[in-house]
Swiss-Prot record:
Expressed by Th1, Th2 and dendritic cells. This is Interleukin-23 receptor. The chain crosses the membrane at residues 375-395. InterPro entries: FN3_dom, FN3_sf, Ig-like_fold, Type1_Cytokine_Rcpt_Type2. It is found in: Cell membrane. It comes from Mus musculus. Residues 24-374 are extracellular.
Amino acid sequence: MSHLTLQLHVVIALYVLFRWCHGGITSINCSGDMWVEPGEIFQMGMNVSIYCQEALKHCRPRNLYFYKNGFKEEFDITRINRTTARIWYKGFSEPHAYMHCTAECPGHFQETLICGKDISSGHPPDAPSNLTCVIYEYSGNMTCTWNTGKPTYIDTKYIVHVKSLETEEEQQYLASSYVKISTDSLQGSRKYLVWVQAVNSLGMENSQQLHVHLDDIVIPSASIISRAETTNDTVPKTIVYWKSKTMIEKVFCEMRYKTTTNQTWSVKEFDANFTYVQQSEFYLEPDSKYVFQVRCQETGKRNWQPWSSPFVHQTSQETGKRNWQPWSSPFVHQTSQTVSQVTAKSSHEPQKMEMLSATIFRGHPASGNHQDIGLLSGMVFLAIMLPIFSLIGIFNRSLRIGIKRKVLLMIPKWLYEDIPNMENSNVAKLLQEKSVFENDNASEQALYVDPVLTEISEISPLEHKPTDYKEERLTGLLETRDCPLGMLSTSSSVVYIPDLNTGYKPQVSNVPPGGNLFINRDERDPTSLETTDDHFARLKTYPNFQFSASSMALLNKTLILDELCLVLNQGEFNSLDIKNSRQEETSIVLQSDSPSETIPAQTLLSDEFVSCLAIGNEDLPSINSYFPQNVLESHFSRISLFQK
């Protein structure tokens, strides 16, 4: 039974709490009444009596119970009559509490809710003090703050009254702890009277009135400490750099500092002009950690900036006595002030100040020591790094190659192009090779010309040679070319061996027209020799033709076919021979009946004969005749007609 009762109490408490959180306990549909003496809001520490009266139907309650913040009260409950009960609190000190009462009806397993109340205790407001109104630079608002005094614990409102001393117009602004008033709403006057009224359920208090001139309450833009450094001079000093975006020219500032282990601040005062860089010098203890803060105000005014954020700096580890003589510079306007005790207008605690020298820099003073140290450091660094990079370049071949490639890409090509060396020329190496390089490029065929025949000798038929000698030579030559012996016979014609890579080319012939191309020596009569002499007299110069590398090896030797010996000796002719030969040159191109028609000379070698003259260990290219065979035959027939 006790367990069930506890669950019922928890449910009722949760229900009351839920209802109180959503609109207050007074929104409960009460089955009776509940009131507080002296009231629902009362001064903290007073004695309080809370009454509960039931008005339930069909219920004669056995007991009435009180709950505070969900917990059942057991003491100081008095049953006044059958329907009313009271609970008494001595020196109630809780700021907020919610109370409800229940009734125990016969025949019900749970208590019945009667009613509930939300009660509060607090203090009447104190008169606002230290009323201050300022205009932060660039904000566009007048900000008024004050000291509210001790907490009231109950809802307290603060009303700011702003009254113009020129127009007598008064404006009121509702606030809690501070207020921001737009300067646009204060255009009617420059002088105002400001005070604050604090009001709550327990009382009302007014602050002292404040006379305000809008031009005198402007605070410069916030100051910020950017960095600090300790120099390594003979007497080490710490330079603190700070800045502000204020447009006010005349500003008075304070900078306070202390070690992190000390509770006493040392304050340094100086005039500042934020048109220039702000630097403050301090002679501090070595190897110590210091905290710096700065604040400023317009010169001659009473309102200060709030202290800037703490800036921590660690001094160097150098030790030694320091001379407290201030450092002077032609670029610096220096002021010193001795203050035994500082009582800031916005601060209530006295602060100890030491005798310090304030140094304000105008511009950027040049530091000769810093420049010398930087130059010396740079020279030492360069002297060390140059040998290191040189050694790396010497021993790292890939790095050298990479650097060389990048340099060659950046400089003009003509600066590093080598003069061709003929000893290492690819052309010279190609001529020295014994292998044949085929060239199928038809565009290069037109560049080949016939070489000059420097000498043509004819063996007289009167000279008798042994038959064995002729047959042996001819047989050996033909057998080496893998050609049938019966296919060749002696001839008195000039034999041209074409370049196998380029096909046929027009050549000169001395064969009598209409005669047999291959005439046996035994069948030739002496009369034919005379005509032959005349025919050879016409051949003084010969067209130039060019041989490939493979053909040169073959043509550098003397080729003797029967009585005719064609000797090709390169380099044995001179300019005089060429000139004489040009004067005596007779064209081998035969003239037709029409003087304007020119018939070119043709090759007299058949395809079978040319194939026999090729080198045996080479792959023969396709024989590309310059003229079809039927064209050659037609030319041969026409030549025969001309001779007749």
